[in-house]
Amino acid sequence: MVHALRARRVITPAGSLDAAVVIEGERIATIKPAHELSADIPVRDLGELALLPGLIDVHTHINEPGRTEWEGFATATRAAAAGGFTTVVDMPLNNLPETTTVTALEAKRAATRDEHGRSKCLIDYALWGGCVDGKQEHLEPLAKAGVAGFKSFLIYPGCDGFTEIDRANLERAIPHLLRTGLPLLVHAELAPAIKVATDDLNHLDANWCRYKTYLASRPDEAELDAIAMLLELCRVHRFRLHIVHLSTAKALPMIAAAKREGLPLTVETCPHYLHLSAEQIADGATQFKCAPPIRSAANREQLWQALRDGTIDLIATDHSPCPPAMKKLDRATAGDDAGRFDKAWGGIASLSTALSVVWTECVARGLTLEQLTQWMAARPALLAGIHAQVGAIAPGLHANLIAFDPEASFTLTHEDLHYRHPISPYLGETLRGRVHETWLRGSTVYQFGGSNAIFSDAAQGREYAIS
């Protein structure tokens, strides 16, 4: 079937166009002025809504199989579609078994389908593999089996089933990584600085319900030490290095210098680091806990400048949900641990909110939809190796699209959160920008309906072929 979507603002690599996007089957056939369309092509006029490429999240924790009570493919991909994402790349941890072998990868693939073999995913997806201590021999088989790249932690990841990797094991893994040509994504914090800070706080009998205590326990130095070590290894071995969820702006000078050297380095930050600040987090408000932590407002502004100048490449959600009891939000579920940042799960669920949160900040800074789609679609596609299929509105690419109202303003409520557990640090905030419709390969998968959001009855999401 051939049809067209017309918008006054079609956000393309060439800029914002008043145009019609012609869709043939699952792909974009052409982009042209609406008056040049053949009369026999059905056209839907989106009015003043902007037409954006479907967003791509390269940092999603779906937690299935093994921890479906945390999230799962069905709920995560619904939340993503409502948030304007048409692709997620699932992390290899927080699921059981962890995705560090081909056998575990196949178990995860099986979990994307129901008992009848039908997809549970409303949008498309790719999968990261894990690079952990003692399993270097599995990296090349995982690459051949189709993972998009590998994820490592330099520190305990917060739950059992996935181990951190030390420098010696990382150096053993690098030759395997180089042979695959795939990126290594790294949680860049080292434990020594955190241990010293935490021991000092405990010696002082610090109050762990205070956010400033938690912030002091994850000092900038933990990130700085890790990033310095990673850049040293990258400088020697020239493997593709991607630093996930950068929090500290103090690392920006060394990152910028490494990029000037030509190191194969990319960096992401997250909506919560770009929108929130330590100064606004109330004591006991564990819904704000993540690792690395949310830092100062001044730090946040430096992250924005780094996005503008290219030191930071892209924005990823780090969608990391958990059951409510694990967030230690209240005495009813947490008892004496209520409000303790040292006991609460460190993660923020963001798939439904990321676009509006980021766009709110873009509007405040005079930034454009063209810039936003680079950070949340084009560059994530490049990192995941799917840029020949998605990441922009261009002929030949999948017709993954979103109708977005950049002028809309709304107060975030629980009804806007479509993931399994509606916990969010943004509840009650006034945000800018609303997704009205999401198309996956030319077919509508989500329509905004207020409290009655409309999702496609038939999930058609599939895994990307990574070559």
Q: What do the PLM-derived regions correspond to, one by one?
A:
Residues V58-E71, T99, D124-K135, C159-F162, ...:
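Active-site mouth loops of central-metabolism enzymes
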Residues E137-I315:
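Histidine/acidic residue-rich metal-binding segments in metalloenzymes
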Residues M1-H3, R9-P53:
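Histidine-rich, glycine-flanked metal-binding segment
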Residues R8, V21, E26, E48, ...:
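Divalent metal-coordination and catalytic microenvironments
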Residues L49-T112, K120:
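Metal-associated gating/positioning segment near the N- to mid-region
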Residues R8, L329-R340, P395-E463:
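C-terminal cap of metal-dependent C-N hydrolases
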Residues Y211-M229, L233-R238, Q287, L314-I315, ...:
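His/Asp/Glu-enriched, well-ordered alpha-helical/loop segment
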Residues A110-G130:
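A glycine-rich helix N-cap at a beta->alpha junction
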